[in-house]
Design a protein with these regions (language model features):
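Short, high-confidence coil segments that cap the C-terminus of an alpha-helix
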Residues: 43, 89, 116-119
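A residue-level structural signature of the nucleotidyltransferase/glycosyltransferase Rossmann-like core
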Residues: 4, 47, 99, 140, ...
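Short phosphate-binding loop-to-helix
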Residues: 47, 53-112
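Conserved core of the sugar-phosphate nucleotidyltransferase
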Residues: 102-191
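A conserved hydrophobic position in a structured secondary element of the catalytic/binding core
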Residues: 50-51, 102, 177, 224
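N-terminal glycine-rich phosphate-binding loop and ensuing alpha1 helix
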Residues: 2-49
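Hydrophobic/aromatic residues located in beta-strands of well-ordered beta-sheets
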Residues: 5, 46-48, 92, 121, ...
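Conserved alpha/beta core of the MobA/IspD/sugar-nucleotide pyrophosphorylase nucleotidyltransferase superfamily
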Residues: 166-248
């Protein structure tokens, strides 16, 4: 099974402009994500998909594989689909470009054991605090007994009316798709649920497509604000001092 990771990266961000190129210990944030994913033994190639000439230039300078996509890609999944048109793989793994300390072993967990019957998968992690549950940037998810997604929401789901004894989950920005799944997404218009929640994955759910949810123990450290960036910089500096990270 040939698995290729693609990191969608756009320069414009509603919360942190130019985020992929912001420096962390002398390297762009996107470089750190790329290097972490490259450590995976089950990923054959890692690519960046972007519409930014500045990001493309950085990738060339740092010998990172890069594909240019159109400037009007409405979603990261659409950008992934565009890049996949010229990149051969059995499974395409989408990795968010704003988690510079992402664990490569966690990324591997989204890969299927076999291709037969596989369509798409998404990692999810337990929510550990009420603040996480009510934060609309954390997309909550519930799954059926077979592990397929039932619904995604920016609101806490399910609502704890009958009991408080429930482990809530949030989706992580690591997904795996077959070419069939990406083609379906690219050629299917948004449904009303996706429009109101602004969650890409609902496009599969609304049309009854299987999206396997895989629970992992991971505390994601995504960079969405200047405060997040400062925190990650401190963590990277500490890991460099301890020899847990190496700049090459």
């Amino acid at each position: 099974m040939r698995a290729v990771a693609i990191i969608p990266a756009r320069y414009g961000s509603s919360r942190l402009q130019g985020k992929p190129l912001m420096e962390i210990c002398g390297r762009p944030m996107l470089w750190w994500v790329y290097q972490q994913v490259k450590k995976s033994e089950k990923i054959q190639e890692v690519w960046v998909a972007t519409d930014s000439p500045d990001i493309q230039r950085m990738c060339r300078e740092r010998h990172m594989l890069c594909r240019m996509t159109s400037a009007d890609c409405p979603t990261s999944t659409q950008r992934l689909w565009e890049a996949a048109q010229t990149i051969s793989a059995d499974v395409y793994v989408c990795v968010n470009g704003d988690e510079p300390l992402i664990d490569p072993q966690v990324v591997e967990q989204v890969l299927p054991q076999r291709l037969e019957g596989f369509f798409a998968a998404n990692l999810m992690a337990p929510i550990r605090s009420p603040a996480e549950a009510v934060d609309e940037s954390n997309i909550k998810v519930v799954a059926d007994r077979q592990g397929n997604a039932l619904y995604f929401s920016r609101s806490p789901i399910p609502h704890p009316k009958g009991s408080l004894d429930f482990l809530y989950y949030k989706h992580l920005g690591v997904l795996a798709y077959t070419k069939e799944a990406l083609d379906f997404f690219a050629h299917t218009p948004k449904g009303p649920l996706e429009q109101v929640e602004d969650v890409n994955e609902l496009r599969f759910v609304e049309h009854g497509k299987p999206l396997r949810m895989i629970p992992v123990e991971s505390r994601s450290l995504s960079v969405d604000t200047e405060k997040d960036l400062a925190h990650v910089r401190r963590l990277v500096e500490e890991k460099l001092r301890q020899g847990k990270l190496v700049i090459t």
